[in-house]
Amino acid sequence: MSKVFIPEGYRAPLSVYELQRAIEFIKSNFQTNLSNALNRRRVSAPLFVEEASGLNDNLNGYERPVSFDIPDVHAEAQVVHSLAKWKRLALKRYQFNVGKGLFTDMNAIRRDEEVDNLHSIYVDQWDWEKVIAREDRNTDYLKRTVRDIVGAVCETNDALGVAFPSLHTKLDRDVFFITTQELEDMYPDKTPKERENEILRQHHTVFLMQIGGKLKSGKPHDGRAPDYDDWDLNGDILMWNPVLQCAFEISSMGIRVDENSLDRQLTLAGCDDRRSLPFHKMLLNGELPLTMGGGIGQSRLCMLMIGACHIGEVQSSIWDRATTDACRDAGILLL
């Protein structure tokens, strides 16, 4: 069922031709800014992984991966949901040292995504991962990295405004940090998404920390798989979307689990069966580097900076009939 929302009086900010130019500009400029900010090396990434490897992201635990068999190699493969675990293994295989990292273009299919203005079954991200020292597994280090990423985003937005003077999106470089428990304490009677909207109305750039574990209410703010982020050292970068008047996630990131936090989180999540998978065995045995990483939505960033009201304006995907009809009637072209 369609959940599309068209703001009253909305008109596409650019022609289709100029839109493509702007998308190209954002992706090229931000990739350079991100690489400079985080000292990353670009690498090639897989579109699919072997099911038995345990490398795919289980997301919230109920999403079904797109799967297919490969007769010639006698294996079942899955199109990736994300590269969170693959990147960590790649850092070991490619022999990256502390302070060095990688980034890559990640393309995923999330078939069970509930599509709306912000969500598509097609996910495109800049994925990054960095080797860190054990003493860097702390909140201060996490916050410094968040500020670096937000700075790169704002630099690209400033450059876009010069290249395309008709675009006027303003982004706030000043990051407000708050934990999910602090946010629940502020708005105990609201849903997690309503809480995000409330805090983003006050602070237009927020890093919402500690996502995955249960809060005092007995529920987590949002789902996170237990085997990549440390739930005490992760979060989402949220920015205010002036077109849709809502909180707008541009990045999910965090310091990754070590052997101790993985052991604890697998038990809390009821996922002890994963301990026998190759990736998880290596991690529990301390054979993988300590890392932090995340993903930054490419279409999300384009949508925000350009001022589009629907993610289908900046990426090509498949939509339900009600959504395509509503957008057509409003003069919105879905790619």
Q: Would you name each region that the model predicts?
A:
Residues 100-102, 123-127, 203-205, 245-247:
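Extracellular structured ligand-interaction cores
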Residues 18-25, 29, 137-144, 148, ...:
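Generic recognition of stable, solvent-exposed alpha-helical segments in well-folded globular domains
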Residues 104-190, 194:
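Extended, charged alpha-beta segments that form solvent-exposed binding/catalytic grooves
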